[in-house]
Amino acid sequence: MVWLGVDLGNARVGLALSDPELTFAHPAGNIHVAGDYFFAIDEVLNVIEDEHVDHVIVGLPLQMDGTEGKSAKKARRWAANLEKRLQAESEDSDSTEYQIPQVSLIDERLTTVSAHRQLFEAHKASNKHRPVVDQQSAVVILQTALDRTREQ
């Protein structure tokens, strides 16, 4: 069993994968999208297939008061479009063994702050954060989901 964490950004989509035991999240790269979220869905579908992903966790960027702003609505639409594409892929698949991965949203408030802090603590120079902060944010999102699952 493998889970995929997704942090949607305007320029990059950060990815993280879990270990098969669903204990640890690790960075899995960025998708450079420049606002083209359909391209991001195509790339995520490739990762899902290549890594045999069972569950996709998408960060939901709520505002500090818990309400949904423009970015959260965009994340919800993106997750819904991913689910539609997964359903279509399932219907087009000849395999009866194809399992559609579950797609969930998780509150990602302050994950970027946490990601920057983790990179700083790892002695990564702050001018080198930009290329990796999205995937580190995806790690924080996914690790939060994994920890919550273990606590239940």
Swiss-Prot record:
Main localization of the protein described in the UniProt heading: cytoplasm
GO MF term set: nuclease activity
Gene3D superfamilies: YqgF/RNase H-like domain
A Gene Ontology biological process term: rRNA 5'-end processing
Top-rank lineage group of the source organism: Bacteria
Statement: the UniProt record of this protein carries the keyword Transmembrane helix: no
Family annotation (SUPFAM superfamilies): Ribonuclease H-like (SSF53098)
InterPro entries hit by this protein: RNaseH-like_sf, YqgF, YqgF/RNaseH-like_dom, YqgF/RNaseH-like_dom_sf
Keywords: Cytoplasm, Hydrolase, Nuclease, Ribosome biogenesis
An annotated GO cellular component: cytosol
E.C. no: 3.1.-.-
Presence of keyword Transcription regulation: no
Role: Could be a nuclease involved in processing of the 5'-end of pre-16S rRNA.
HAMAP family per the UniProt record, alphabetical: Nuclease_YqgF (MF_00651)
Family indicated by similarity: Belongs to the YqgF nuclease family.
Identification of the protein by name: Putative pre-16S rRNA nuclease
Organism: Bifidobacterium longum (strain NCC 2705)
